[in-house]
Curated annotation (Swiss-Prot):
<keyword id="KW-0949">S-adenosyl-L-methionine</keyword>
<dbReference type="Pfam" id="PF04445">
    <property type="entry name" value="SAM_MT"/>
</dbReference>
<dbReference type="GO" id="GO:0008990">
    <property type="term" value="F:rRNA (guanine-N2-)-methyltransferase activity"/>
</dbReference>
<protein>
    <recommendedName>
        <fullName>Ribosomal RNA small subunit methyltransferase J</fullName>
        <ecNumber>2.1.1.242</ecNumber>
    </recommendedName>
</protein>
<dbReference type="GO" id="GO:0005737">
    <property type="term" value="C:cytoplasm"/>
</dbReference>
<feature type="compositionally biased region" description="Basic and acidic residues">
    <location>
        <begin position="239"/>
        <end position="252"/>
    </location>
</feature>
<dbReference type="InterPro" id="IPR029063">
    <property type="entry name" value="SAM-dependent_MTases_sf"/>
</dbReference>
<feature type="region of interest" description="Disordered">
    <location>
        <begin position="232"/>
        <end position="258"/>
    </location>
</feature>
<keyword id="KW-0963">Cytoplasm</keyword>
<comment type="similarity">
    <text>Belongs to the methyltransferase superfamily. RsmJ family.</text>
</comment>
<keyword id="KW-0489">Methyltransferase</keyword>
<comment type="function">
    <text>Specifically methylates the guanosine in position 1516 of 16S rRNA.</text>
</comment>
<dbReference type="InterPro" id="IPR007536">
    <property type="entry name" value="16SrRNA_methylTrfase_J"/>
</dbReference>
<keyword id="KW-0808">Transferase</keyword>
<feature type="binding site">
    <location>
        <position position="177"/>
    </location>
    <ligand>
        <name>S-adenosyl-L-methionine</name>
    </ligand>
</feature>
<feature type="binding site">
    <location>
        <begin position="123"/>
        <end position="124"/>
    </location>
    <ligand>
        <name>S-adenosyl-L-methionine</name>
    </ligand>
</feature>
<keyword id="KW-0698">rRNA processing</keyword>
């Protein structure tokens, strides 16, 4: 895995965004000019995005809670009946407080927030956290989506350390979706994964993540896994909910009540 700050540059997509690009470069401690960079953090009219560079590179990755996939899932995603809702314990009169300790681009957290859950998100990779921060800021300006992202609070840093040092009321549910070691050689791997993997690597500390989550959550821990992946080393889940490509392993501690 590349170290943060190597092979990545920041660039403005047009002159009017030069000041914003310079501010992000300073904050992320990345150069504005690096001809040998493998990735570019780009600032433009659509906000912040990461673009892998090179002839075979997929399109840019950005966070958009207002349009596209997030909007479609919000309108047609199945509401309280979808598997993630059942996994975290959403039921009539029950909207648990959820900590998503592996936030990524915030897609799952947004779904849960749209169903009424108060969400705290932790993202450890600074570039992905920056995309998330930018996407949340743009979404707050939208009349419909602003109320949803108002239920999403972003923290950055190492989730294990943050959970171990947690102060205040613990989250009722902790949701984990660790990056699973990659075995799919097909060309159809999602562009997010193609961009993320060199930046993030695999979550080899998943057992420690689970251990910290089980120590902190007051009611349950939910782990999302590829359907055929082994469970995380450690305590066994009580049961699982299985979909076409994913599985939710449930580790209950206490019943969620209305």
């Amino acid at each position: 895995m590349e170290e943060q700050g190597t092979g990545i540059r920041v660039e403005a997509l047009s002159a009017e965004f030069a000041a914003q690009a310079a501010a992000w470069a300073e904050r992320l401690e990345l150069p504005l000019h690096d001809e040998a960079a493998d990735f570019a953090v780009q600032v433009g009219a659509d906000g912040l995005q990461i673009q892998q560079l090179g002839p075979q590179a997929p399109g840019p990755v950005r966070v958009d809670f207002v349009e596209g996939q997030a909007a479609h899932r919000r309108q047609f995603g199945g509401g309280n009946g979808q598997m993630i809702a059942k996994a975290v314990g959403i039921a009539q009169g029950v909207r648990p407080q959820v900590l998503d300790a592996t936030a990524g681009l915030g897609k799952d957290a947004f779904v849960l927030a749209s169903l009424g859950c108060q969400m705290t998100l932790i993202e450890r990779q600074p570039l992905i956290a920056a995309l998330l921060e930018d996407g949340l800021a743009r979404a707050r300006a939208d009349e419909e989506v602003g109320a949803i992202v108002g239920r999403m609070r972003l923290l950055t840093g190492n989730a294990i350390e943050r959970m171990r040092a947690w102060e205040g009321e613990p989250p009722q549910v902790i949701y984990l979706d660790p990056m699973f070691p990659h075995r799919d050689k097909s060309a159809l791997v999602k562009k997010e994964m193609r961009v993320f993997r060199p930046l993030v690597g695999d979550d080899l500390d998943a057992p420690a993540l689970l251990e910290a989550a089980l120590a902190l959550a007051s009611h349950r821990v939910v782990v999302k896994r590829p359907r055929k992946a082994p469970i995380i080393d450690g305590p066994k889940p009580s049961h699982s909910l299985e979909g076409k490509s994913s599985r939710y392993d449930i580790y209950p501690k206490k019943a969620l009540k209305a």
